[in-house]
Amino acid sequence: MFSVLDWKPKIGILGGGQLGWMIVLEGRKYPFTFYVLENDKNAPACRIADRCFSPQDYKEFVDSSDVITFEFEHVYEKALEYAEYSGKLLPRLNSVELKRERYKEKLFYRQHNLPTPRFYVAEDGEEALKILREEFNNVGVIKESKGGYDGKGQYFIFNDVEKYQFLREKKEKMVVEEYVKFDFEASIIIARDKRGVFISYPPTYNYNEKGILVYNYGPYNNQNIVEIARRLSEELDYVGIMGVEVFVVNGKVLINEFAPRVHNTGHYTLDGALISQFEQHLRAIIGMELGPSTILSPSGMVNILGTDKIPVEVLKYGKVYWYSKSEVRKRRKMGHVNVVGNNLEEVKQKIDKIMQLIYTNGLDL
């Protein structure tokens, strides 16, 4: 162990979006230096980092840093691989490789007896449609293997398979999965350090629409989710923060997917926990002791999606985090609002008020 005053680490972050921004914000409590690798110099994390490197300068970026982490696993492949080669990447590349192709992630769950919805791997779109017909009677989910996040590349099919004949033209592998009629969706934020010490924040209830998180709240106490996430982190020999999303069906827990990084469903920890997921991630990757995952009160979060205009009345119900992105796009996460309360019902009421204020005409995703 060490004192942060004895070693002032230089921490490199791949990606300059809001997750990197919040990592840097939370890290400013300590004498750390932050470098960001990002093409857009006006990106949220670049605006507050000590230095922002261009992607072509990834070797200098890695060589200048003591440890490298990432806010998003689908970018800067050469930089990720060079950081792994240099022995500086945390979480390690094995977790990223599972996320590069969805079928590898699903097969990993099967190999390690981690519960997940029934699925098949198809070699191309034509085989995917055949499997959907023969195994699931044309009711299920076809998922493209690459680039899947925030609901992208997923096709929910309910006996309207004729609308999806365009998938026959796709020549890459796909996952064909049963459609799960879940009671609700949930997630958990866990941390694991270099010595294998594991901690978890309480799970939360999540509400997603068209594959993108709209809001979440907790705590939702479910030890089964904790143990499944623990097993997953141990099988990966994981270091850092991880988000694990699950379906809850009649009390049974099925893994939907994991994210090898700080996660949208953990934003509430900025105000609802003693130590946020972002600080906990930094502690894990530089070798500090993990802190307690103590929740100070029931809490939750609402995403601000596709708009840069919200009513000032929102401030009555929660704390706004504004990412100051340069361009507004449909579905784009422009900020979020954290709420706390004396109990879950109060938190849910505040979330309802915020939803009504931000999305006056309903969600348009």
Curated annotation (Swiss-Prot):
Source domain of life is Archaea
Quote the Pfam families the UniProt record gives. ATP-grasp, PurK_C, RS_preATP-grasp-like
Entry EC no(s)? 6.3.4.18
The protein's annotated pathway: Purine metabolism; IMP biosynthesis via de novo pathway; 5-amino-1-(5-phospho-D-ribosyl)imidazole-4-carboxylate from 5-amino-1-(5-phospho-D-ribosyl)imidazole (N5-CAIR route): step 1/2
Q: Where does ATP bind?
A: 102, 143, 148-154, 177-180, 185, 256-257
GO MF terms, alphabetically ordered:
5-(carboxyamino)imidazole ribonucleotide synthase activity; ATP binding; metal ion binding; phosphoribosylaminoimidazole carboxylase activity
The subunit structure is:
Homodimer.
PANTHER family referenced in this protein's UniProt entry, alphabetically: PHOSPHORIBOSYLAMINOIMIDAZOLE CARBOXYLASE (PTHR11609:SF5), PURINE BIOSYNTHESIS PROTEIN 6/7, PUR6/7 (PTHR11609)
What family does the Swiss-Prot or TrEMBL record give for this protein? Belongs to the PurK/PurT family.
Q: Quote the function comment for this protein.
A: Catalyzes the ATP-dependent conversion of 5-aminoimidazole ribonucleotide (AIR) and HCO(3)(-) to N5-carboxyaminoimidazole ribonucleotide (N5-CAIR).
UniProt name for this protein:
N5-carboxyaminoimidazole ribonucleotide synthase
Organism annotation = Saccharolobus solfataricus (strain ATCC 35092 / DSM 1617 / JCM 11322 / P2)
